[in-house]
Amino acid sequence: MKLHELRAAEGANKASKRVGRGTGSGLGKTSGRGQNGQNSRSGGGVRPGFEGGQMPLYRRLPKRGFKNIFAKEYAAINLDRLNCFEDGTVVTPELLVEKRVVKKVKDGVKILGNGNIEKKLTVKAAKFSKSAIEKIEAAGGKVEVI
C-alpha cells in the first residue's frame, strides 16, 4: 500500500445534503422544510418559552424568595473524615484542601459531629457543632475557633 492509495473508511466522509436544486432531487422547491411559514424562513421560529400568545409558564408562576448576599457558606466536614490525619496533627482549613478532604474553603469550615474520631488532633475551623467539640475533646484533642 502506498500513500496515494489510502482511502477513507466506508461512511467516514458523508456528502452534505444539497437542497433546493430541482424537484428531481427530492429536496427541491421547499428544501425539506414543508410549506411556507415562519418556520420555513431563515432564522424563523419562536423564542424559547413562547406559547403562541398564551401567558407563558414562567410568567404564570409567582416569583418567590431572594438571594441573601450576606449569607455565609461553610464547607461542612464530618468527624470521621478527620481520621486520615496522624496523631498530634494541627488540622487547618488549608491542610484540609491540601489533603483533598474538602474541595474549597468558602467562608470557612464547619466541623460536624457525625462519626467517631480516634486520633488526638488540634482542629482549627470557623465553626463546630456541639457534638463535634465533645467528641474531639473526649479523644484528647483541642478545638480552636478561627
From Swiss-Prot:
Keywords: Ribonucleoprotein, Ribosomal protein, RNA-binding, rRNA-binding. GO terms for cellular component: cytosolic large ribosomal subunit. GO terms for molecular function: rRNA binding; structural constituent of ribosome. It comes from the Bacteria. The keyword Oxidoreductase does not apply. One of its GO terms (biological process) is translation. Residues 21-35, 42-52 have a biased composition (Gly residues). Pfam families: Ribosomal_L27A. The keyword Lipid metabolism does not apply. Residues 1-56 are annotated as: Disordered. Part of the 50S ribosomal subunit. Binds to the 23S rRNA. Belongs to the universal ribosomal protein uL15 family. This is Large ribosomal subunit protein uL15.
